[in-house]
């Protein structure tokens, strides 16, 4: 899925929701970062996590935010303006402009599942990571990502269309094997699953509904059907029978 300015805006707003905040807290708690460390955030988006990492490593440390989107990096630059220890890199995850073994820790959030050759990106991250350094990744089990409240058949068609948005629907199930093959150890998975029963601006569901609707239109789902789907979700929310579920998984691993 290409991150246009509109998609990037929705992504940043979803990241600022309560679920996005709790996800960042989980990443920060899982990532063993100390003052003076160098940390890389792969596909940093609008820089929400970068600002926290910059505080963690302090003035003697450094944080690198990598993203292929110029729009996202512009937002990250604004978000991190007060932090002089942040450098932004405009590139893809399979071509990181950093020396070998230069980072104490690397994090990525909802990134790897969008990369077709994920093995090349994992190998590149491993090149940059110091031996003994930690990689913390969050990816979604997309088979368990679902809105509830619309007509079942229509809902299924919308969700089926959305499956084309990423290359790896169930990447967390594959990561332990891939990381083991690269020499990682102490691999552990943590569920970050959540449920939204409301459709308001403090929930990721509010923004993801808009994102899915736009993507479905691009997959040739009729505009009338997409409109009906959104109307049915709104009615379900008003009647107290709306739901949205998502199953992110945090995978942490130490490079051997």
Q: What does each model-found stretch correspond to?
A:
Residues 136-201:
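Conserved catalytic/acceptor-binding region of the Class I
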Residues 104-117:
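A short SAM/SAH-binding and catalytic strip from SAM-dependent methyltransferases
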Residues 2-9, 13, 187-243:
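C-terminal helical/coil "lid" or tail adjacent to the Rossmann-like core of SAM-dependent
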Residues 1-37, 48-56, 71-75, 79:
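Conserved class I S-adenosyl-L-methionine
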Residues 119-131:
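A short glycine-rich, Lys/Arg-flanked "PGG" loop and its adjoining helix->strand segment in the class I
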Residues 94-105:
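A short acidic, Gly/Pro-enriched loop at the edge of an enzyme's catalytic core
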Residues 59-60, 129-134:
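Short glycine-dipeptide loop
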Residues 38-42, 46-95:
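Class I SAM-dependent methyltransferase SAM/SAH-binding core
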């Amino acid at each position: 899925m290409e991150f246009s300015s509109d998609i990037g805006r929705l992504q940043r707003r979803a990241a600022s929701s309560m679920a996005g905040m709790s996800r960042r807290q989980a990443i920060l708690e899982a990532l063993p970062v100390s003052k003076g460390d160098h940390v890389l955030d792969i596909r940093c988006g609008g820089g929400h996590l970068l600002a926290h990492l910059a505080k963690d490593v302090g003035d003697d440390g450094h944080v690198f935010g990598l993203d292929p989107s110029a729009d996202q990096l512009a937002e990250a630059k604004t978000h991190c303006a007060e932090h002089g220890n942040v450098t932004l890199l405009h590139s893809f995850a399979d071509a990181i402009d950093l020396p070998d073994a230069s980072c104490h820790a690397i994090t990525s959030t909802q990134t790897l599942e969008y990369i077709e050759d994920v093995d090349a990106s994992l190998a590149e991250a491993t090149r940059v990571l110091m031996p003994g350094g930690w990689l913390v990744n969050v990816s979604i089990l997309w088979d368990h990502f679902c809105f509830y409240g619309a007509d079942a058949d229509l809902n299924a068609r919308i969700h089926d269309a959305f499956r084309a948005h990423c290359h790896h629907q169930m990447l967390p199930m594959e990561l332990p094997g891939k990381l083991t093959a690269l020499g990682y150890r102490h691999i552990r998975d943590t569920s970050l699953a959540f449920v939204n029963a409301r459709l308001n601006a403090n929930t990721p569901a509010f923004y993801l509904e808009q994102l899915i609707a736009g993507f479905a239109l691009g997959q040739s789902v009729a505009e009338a059907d997409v409109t009906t789907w959104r109307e049915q979700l709104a009615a379900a929310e008003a009647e107290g029978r709306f739901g949205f579920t998502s199953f992110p998984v945090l995978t942490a691993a130490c490079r051997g």
